From Swiss-Prot:
Enzyme Commission number: 2.7.1.28, 2.7.1.29
A family per Pfam: Dak1
Domain of life: Eukaryota
Location of N-acetylserine modifications: S2
The protein's name in its UniProt record: Dihydroxyacetone kinase 1
Catalytic residues (UniProt): H220 (tele-hemiaminal-histidine intermediate)
Organismal lineage: Eukaryota, Fungi, Dikarya, Ascomycota, Saccharomycotina
Physiological role: Catalyzes both the phosphorylation of dihydroxyacetone and of glyceraldehyde.
Organism: Saccharomyces cerevisiae (strain ATCC 204508 / S288c)
Pathway: Polyol metabolism; glycerol fermentation; glycerone phosphate from glycerol (oxidative route): step 2/2
Length: 584
């Protein structure tokens, strides 16, 4: 692939501004990277989002009959909880509830999940639907992480959007969320790419040579299921490698959806960004031929185009939706639904939908009163602020001191940024100590949750932010009055609530080779003994045990064996706790 590319300054904001200029019925809130449209007050609004670089996903599918809004982060990075919560506020102003349709990537799930929790705490009717349709990472490798999200997500946007437009006033948020699950349960997708994409502002890098390509490469340049060497013909790629991964009923690792002989099937061929329309049309034709010849499947509807990209990714994906099984599942709960195809083909004016009809509507105005950037919590639990500040400083100093070691570990099992991310997190605490509530621990912890998310970003920021948000909520539940002093017993109970809250948004558990392997033993030991020293020792033992585990979560779960190396996230947490311990 050529390393040449068009580069602009501030590419994400420039792209959003250009999109809004070309689509005047959609409003852009530049400082929040939010785009939204008008929504009827008796209907459920849909919001999606994630990292930039997949256009027209997500903003391109804002329109009547599809999404009500989208919120995006930087390139390949989840938007923050603040952004998402503000998007919820804006869209909910003229809706009866909000469904967040989230691609199954850890950072997205954590940040959108935390936003939904905070929205519900504000009295907003809000739920999350997590979508995953990829078959490249099968059940064995995907484990508890689940399937990655690919272009099939757009079919969820379209079908659920049509349902929300027509029926959500009757069936509400729960009914709309159920439709999303039904469609996701009947979707399978696999992608292939000749090379990595070129990310704006970064040097092009690839492990593939001119004679290699990758089967199952993800939309963020993640590894696929197999490197093909030499590159097969396009016909062989489709017939011998891609379709069997979607349709082989004997492949128990990937047979996520059953296709019977008489089932109606929708075919979506998606351009990952760098393939010409001419070639995509040819690929669509060949795919249809092989479906008929090898599987006796004649798609009842075929969609081809550029729906979910990876910048200029020189590849494509194939998605199959079992329309028959989806229709039957829908009909069991929604008597009005005659066919899922009616929802798929219902009117939309979303600019990115390839078979849309367009109608001009005026853009909504921004209600600035709904945009908030301060996190607040019910004020309970008095505490010694000066001691607390010293503990935080000592913990931060220990993490900063240990950063080279943490980075060395992460270079072996991850992407090498864990140490830097943790340092950014602890600096986010120490640099904002003067802003913390000195009268209420619940409010102070909620503020720290916000500072950490803003300074760390990514998956780690989401995990720690949710954990601390849960701890704040635990203090609110356990403390009997605003002025009750926080004791070890209160902290212990609140930590248990915090851990339970975190477990709502990650499937990682002890034994998964993550920071949970240090966190859970710490919480359990402190809950049992109320002894911080014993709890730190339990955390250290948990971190050491990760050297014997295979990673099941995060980027390390997609690469090779990581045995004999302690998980850097677990080690980083222990270093912080040891720093606090030294200041007690």
């Amino acid at each position: 692939m050529s390393a040449k590319s068009f580069e602009v300054t501030d590419p994400v904001n420039s792209s959003l501004k250009g999109f809004a200029l070309a689509n005047p019925s959609i409003t852009l809130v530049p400082e929040e990277k939010i785009l939204f449209r008008k929504t009827d007050s008796d209907k459920i609004a849909l919001i999606s989002g994630g990292g930039s670089g997949h256009e027209p996903t997500h903003a391109g599918f804002i329109g009547k009959g599809m999404l009500s809004g989208a919120v995006v982060g930087e390139i390949f990075a989840s938007p923050s909880t603040k952004q998402i919560l503000n998007a919820i506020r804006l869209v909910n102003e003229n809706a009866s509830g909000v469904l967040l349709i989230v691609k199954n990537y850890t950072g997205d799930v954590l940040h959108f999940g935390l936003s939904a929790e905070r929205a519900r705490a504000l009295g907003i009717n809000c739920r999350v639907a997590v979508i995953g349709d990829d078959v490249a990472v099968g059940r064995e490798k995907g484990g508890m992480v689940g399937r990655r999200a690919l272009a099939g997500t757009v079919l969820v946007h379209k079908i659920v959007g049509a349902f929300a437009e027509e029926y959500s006033s009757k069936y509400g948020l729960d009914g709309t969320a159920k439709v999303a699950k039904i469609i996701n349960d009947n979707l399978v997708t696999i992608g292939s790419s000749l090379d990595h994409c070129k990310v704006p502002g970064r040097k092009f890098e690839s492990e593939l040579n001119e004679k290699q390509m990758e089967l199952g490469m993800g939309i963020h340049n993640e590894p696929g299921v197999k490197v093909l060497d030499p590159i097969p013909s396009t016909e062989d790629l489709i017939s011998k490698y891609m379709l069997p991964k979607l349709l082989d009923p004997n492949d128990k690792d990937r047979a996520f959806v059953k296709f019977d002989e008489d089932d109606e099937v929708v075919l979506l061929v998606n351009n990952l960004g760098g393939v010409s329309n001419f070639v995509i049309s040819s690929i669509t034709s060949k795919t249809t031929d092989f479906l008929k010849e090898n599987y006796n499947i004649t798609p009842v509807q075929t969609i081809a185009g550029t729906l979910m990209t990876s910048f200029n990714g020189n590849g494509f994906s194939i998605t199959l939706l079992n329309a028959t099984k989806a229709t039957k599942a829908l009909q069991s709960d929604f008597e009005e639904i005659k066919s899922v195809l009616d929802l798929l083909n219902a009117f939309t004016n979303a600019p990115g939908w390839p078979i849309a009809d367009f109608e001009k509507t005026s853009a909504p105005s921004v209600n600035d009163d709904l945009l908030h950037n301060e996190v607040t919590a019910k004020a309970v639990g008095t505490y010694d602020f000066d001691k607390f500040a010293e503990w935080m400083k000592s913990g931060a100093e220990q993490v900063i001191k240990s950063e080279p070691h943490i980075t060395e570990l992460d270079n072996q099992v991850g992407d090498g940024d864990c140490g830097y991310t943790l340092v950014a997190g602890v600096k986010g605490i120490t640099e904002n100590l003067d802003k913390l509530s000195k009268d209420s621990l619940s409010q102070a912890v909620a503020q720290i949750s916000d500072f950490i998310e803003g300074s760390m970003g990514g998956t780690s920021g989401g995990l720690y932010s949710i954990l601390l948000s849960g701890f704040s909520h635990g203090l609110i539940q356990v403390c009997k009055s605003k002025d009750e002093p926080v004791t070890k017993e209160i902290v212990a109970k609140s930590l248990g609530i915090a851990l339970d809250t975190l477990y709502k948004y990650t499937k990682a558990r002890k034994g998964s080779s993550t920071m949970i392997d240090a966190l859970e033993p710490f919480v359990k030991e402190f809950t049992a003994s109320k002894d911080f020293n014993k709890a730190v020792k339990a955390a250290e033992e948990g971190a050491k045990s990760t050297a014997t585990f295979e990673a099941k979560f995060g980027r390390a779960s997609y690469v090779g064996d990581s045995s004999q190396v302690e998980d850097p996230g677990a080690v980083g947490l222990c270093e912080f706790l040891k720093g606090v311990q030294s200041a007690l």
